[in-house]
Amino acid sequence: MIKSKLFAKHKNISHGFFNSLGGYSNGIYKSLNCGIGSKDNKININQNLKKVCQKIKCSRKNLILLNQIHSNKVFSINRTPKKKPLGDALVTSKNKLALGILTADCAPVFIIDPKKKIISAIHAGWKGAYKKIIYKTIYKLKKKGSSIKDLYAVIGPCISKKNYEVKKDFLKKFTVRNKKN
């Protein structure tokens, strides 16, 4: 588990970025596969999720996951939902709830407000980033009472610029919007 030094200062907030090592899955899924929607053996997935929960000290019932769709949909969570929300970011101020997202190439982004005790987890792929999912998550944090000056953010492991080739027309989508991109 990879931890942010920035977030480690806030003892009341547990977090971690997991890689694919040390899981129960095998074959083509040989990893710490937590993708409930994958064709991996469900027993292995549940063992992997249990392992993650033990590491971050939460019950499996309180680990909230999404059906990620590369969108800009952000959900405020106050209790464990009956089924996984369809979107790419979660926000909560409820103690004992853990927010989880799954990534490979996309960027996992955590934003916290330690003063208001509000946390968020964002699955930021290029489509979600283009559709302003991070901005929309910050907006949701502000609606819950956060101030920008109190927010801390970390980006977890994701694909590097060197390994993510794009064509000029793709790049233009982002640079037309903002020359600094």
Regions found by a protein language model. Name each.
Residues M1-N181:
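Active-site microenvironment for binding and transforming phosphate-containing groups
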